[in-house]
Amino acid sequence: MPRFQLSNSTSVPNHNYEWSYEYYDDEEPVSFEGLKAHRYSIVIGFWVGLAVFVIFMFFVLTLLTKTGAPHPEAAEPYEKRMRLTSCADGLGRQRETDGRTGLSRPLLEESRSLFHCYINEEEREGGRAATDAGALTHGRSGIGNSRGQVEEVGLVVQNMVLESRAEREAALLAHFNIPNFVNSELNSALGDEDLLLGDPPIIMEEARPRCTHHIID
């Protein structure tokens, strides 16, 4: 281990400076015997991490139970109420404007509403007929009747439904008073002259011989 010392004295009294340098040359190799990993270090790390994760989730769940998460089911009725109130307000405003202007409700809207009511009634009657047919077939099958009787019941129910639909369509057509024929009296009353939109076209073929006649003269 070499050692080098250097002393230096300045002109200032009672101030002596001394520099010393020391060098250590360790030729021995570094040993890593104490730094070997434990045999079950991976297993220990896994279980420690799992325990930390469980504790963290426990605290998160406790905080959620205290504060409470938002419930989307409670938000949907509120939105529906808002929509219904907005629709009601819109209808009220429309009625007020109609009352101010003095205009009556158009016939087209009334026909649409009647058509929708007719469709709803048809669907309800169809569902009732299907349930009645199912009840009849179930009861008769429990008694032990044959398939022919069940088919007859189905045909009877189907005929009843068709008759009810035909009657309702006839009533609906009578209500709207839609004509299903063409009035030919108006067409017969009109003559050929009335059907013409303008004067007949001028034929230019008659003028051609006259022109040639003038040229010959």
Curated annotation (Swiss-Prot):
GO cellular component terms given for this protein: endoplasmic reticulum; endoplasmic reticulum membrane; Golgi apparatus; plasma membrane
Any GO molecular function: type 4 melanocortin receptor binding
UniProtKB keywords: Cell membrane, Endoplasmic reticulum, Glycoprotein, Membrane, Transmembrane, Transmembrane helix
Bilayer topology annotation: Single-pass membrane protein
Pfam families referenced in this protein's UniProt entry, alphabetically: MRAP (PF15183)
Main location: membrane
Highest taxon of the lineage: Eukaryota
Localization (cell): Cell membrane; Endoplasmic reticulum membrane
Transmembrane segments: 42-62
GO biological process: developmental growth; energy homeostasis; energy reserve metabolic process; negative regulation of adenylate cyclase-activating G protein-coupled receptor signaling pathway; protein localization to cell surface; protein localization to plasma membrane; regulation of adenylate cyclase-activating G protein-coupled receptor signaling pathway; regulation of growth
Xref: InterPro entries: MRAP
Positions glycosylated per UniProt: 8
Subunit-level organization: Interacts with mc4r.
Miscellaneous comment as given in the Swiss-Prot or TrEMBL entry: Two paralogs of MRAP2 are present in zebrafish: mrap2a, which plays a role during larval development and mrap2b, which constitutes the ortholog of mammalian MRAP2.
Family, as annotated: Belongs to the MRAP family.
Function: Inhibitor of melanocortin receptor 4 (mc4r), a receptor involved in energy homeostasis. Plays a role during larval development in the control of energy homeostasis and body weight regulation by decreasing ligand-sensitivity of mc4r and mc4r-mediated generation of cAMP, leading to stimulate growth during larval development. Acts by stabilizing an inactive conformation of mc4r during embryonic development, when all the energy consumed is obtained from the yolk sac, possibly to speed the rapid maturation to the mobile free-feeding juvenile stage reached at 5 dpf.
The protein, known as: Melanocortin-2 receptor accessory protein 2A
Organism this protein belongs to: Danio rerio (Zebrafish)
